[in-house]
From Swiss-Prot:
Residues 87-225 form a coiled coil. It comes from Homo sapiens (Human). The keyword Disulfide bond applies. Contributes to the regulation of axonal growth in the embryonic and adult central nervous system by inhibiting interactions between RTN4R and LINGO1. Inhibits RTN4R-mediated axon growth cone collapse. May play an important role in regulating the production of neural crest cells by the neural tube. May be required for normal responses to olfactory stimuli. Keywords: Cell projection, Coiled coil, Developmental protein, Disulfide bond, Endoplasmic reticulum, Glycoprotein, Secreted, Signal, Synapse. The gene is OLFM1. One of its GO terms (cellular component) is synapse. Residues 226-478 form the Olfactomedin-like domain. SUPFAM superfamilies: YVTN repeat-like/Quinoprotein amine dehydrogenase (SSF50969). This is Noelin. One of its GO terms (biological process) is neuronal signal transduction. Glycans are attached at residues 33, 103, 187, 288, 307, 394, 431, 473. Pfam families: Noelin-1 (PF12308), OLF (PF02191). The keyword Glycoprotein applies.
Length: 485
């Protein structure tokens, strides 16, 4: 076969492959074979549904909503794992699709240039073939004037080229098809650009602003949800069995991310050594710990670790000490004026538990009793740096009748005992200076609670119960009005 015929064959083969690829691959690229747009509510496209991500990990999810008898909206909202707004999945797909179409458009542009060049070559050959056909007819009419050998050569050449005439016609049709594809891709690119501008403007400008505003409102809502009214206490989880009947253990609610240390203090008086475990897992499974020696022995089980310091009541005194656990130095000491000590106003179980230090979402607290308040519980909020008393509330609940106490969101909760059947039955709200009697039972698994403290970071109660270190989860009730968001 001659070189021109080989070239035409290659071009035709390439065109067949391109035509087949365009008919099969292009619909899948633009989503025509898998995507169906539907209108919402009477033929109007629901754009808010169309552009929001379908992945629940990338969006705020409202799983249920209702109104109570007073018309307040009650809903369950699950926040995304990442705080930053991720771009819409459909818009990303649109951007990727547009890039593919643009790449395809460039490829078709190159193919079109080659096709036009080859088409010129084919048209030239077509003219040559027509000229040969005309010349052959002339030769047939005047064959007597030519030698038989020349006649046979021309006839053979014409017979070889004649079958290519319909093929060349088909090639010209394919060239028109390529041009049509080029125009359609250009139209599709234009539509996608307009769609991207429309969706992009909504998603990355208006939608981003709306989502950012929603995030701020929900973040404020979550901060409000950090506080609530205690409505339930879970069954206990025994973390470890260790030490004597009395003691305290805790984690730092202000510890930085990754700092999961556990602090352990056995006994309730005349002891100076604090154990530090690297993590809750180490605390549960090993006896590997670092020991810190305090400059003075502690009194009771009301110690707390807060922002890297341990706060404790100095033995046989009403002095509060702030001790830095990193530098192992005393940062501050201050007397808690009029507070009873040395088993004057202890909890019902005794144990020099006159002064009980606590932390909640708002900071550091001290619970104690004074003669001036007839031995009833006094609540004071302390400055965690200076230990200065910021504000004080006098309650009417006798300190010696309380089994244990803890503070959640500025509300003091008091148990009715420390052994046997136990419940939380008194609550004093410092924000309103009011109290109420409640009935929240919880399981006293080992029949002797000598320490019960709330950790606002874990939303859990830490307890020491007859030589067992225990955790309770708490349930808080929240009411957030829409005008508060």
């Amino acid at each position: 076969m001659s070189v021109p015929l080989l070239k035409i064959g290659v071009v035709l083969s390439t065109m067949a492959m391109i035509t087949n690829w365009m008919s099969q691959t292009l619909p899948s690229l633009v989503g025509l074979n898998t995507t169906k747009l539907s209108a919402a509510g009477g033929g109007t496209l629901d754009r808010s549904t169309g552009v929001l991500p379908t992945n629940p990990e990338e969006s705020w999810q409202v799983y249920s909503s209702a109104q109570d008898s007073e018309g307040r909206c009650i809903c369950t909202v699950v926040a995304p794992q990442q705080t930053m707004c991720s771009r819409d999945a459909r818009t990303k797909q649109l951007r990727q699709l547009l890039e593919k179409v643009q790449n395809m458009s460039q490829s078709i542009e190159v193919l079109d240039r080659r096709t036009q060049r080859d088409l010129q070559y084919v048209e030239k050959m077509e003219n040559q073939m027509k000229g040969l056909e005309s010349k052959f007819k002339q030769v047939e009419e005047s064959h007597k004037q030519h030698l038989a050998r020349q006649f046979k050569a021309i006839k053979a050449k014409m017979d070889e080229l004649r079958p290519l005439i319909p093929v060349l016609e088909e090639y010209k049709a394919d060239a028109k098809l390529v041009l049509q594809f080029k125009e359609e891709v250009q139209n599709l690119t234009s539509v996608l650009n307009e769609l991207q501008e429309e969706i992009g403007a909504y998603d990355y400008d208006e939608l981003q602003s709306r989502v950012s505003n929603l995030e701020e409102r929900l973040r404020a809502c979550m901060q409000k949800l950090a506080c609530g009214k205690l409505t339930g206490i879970s069954d206990p989880v025994t973390v470890k069995t260790s030490g004597s009947r009395f003691g305290s253990w805790m984690t730092d609610p202000l510890a930085p991310e990754g700092d999961n240390r556990v602090w352990y203090m056995d006994g309730y008086h005349n002891n100076r050594f604090v154990r530090e475990y690297k993590s809750m897992v180490d605390f549960m499974n090993t006896d590997n710990f670092t020991s810190h020696r305090l400059p003075h022995p502690w009194s009771g089980t009301g110690q707390v670790v807060y922002n890297g310091s341990i706060y404790f009541n100095k033995f046989q005194s009403h002095i509060i000490i702030r001790f830095d656990l990193k530098t192992e130095t005393i940062l501050k000491t201050r007397s808690l004026d009029y507070a009873g000590y040395n088993n004057m106003y202890h909890y019902a179980w005794g144990g020099h538990s006159d002064i009980d230090l606590m932390v909640d979402e708002s900071g550091l607290w001290a619970v104690y009793a004074t003669n001036q308040n007839a031995g009833n519980i006094v609540v004071s909020r302390l400055d965690p740096v200076s230990l200065q008393t910021l504000q004080t509330w006098n309650t009417s609940y006798p300190k010696r009748s309380a089994g244990e106490a803890f503070i959640i969101c500025g509300t003091l909760y008091v148990t009715n005992g420390y052994s046997g059947g136990t419940k939380v039955h008194y609550a004093y709200q410092t924000n309103a200076s009011t109290y109420e009697y409640i009935d929240i039972p919880f399981q006293n698994k080992y029949s002797h609670i000598s320490m019960l403290d709330y950790n606002p970071k874990d939303r859990a109660l830490y307890a020491w119960n007859n030589g067992h270190q225990i955790l309770y989860n708490v349930t808080l009730f929240h009411v957030i009005r829409s005008d508060e968001l």
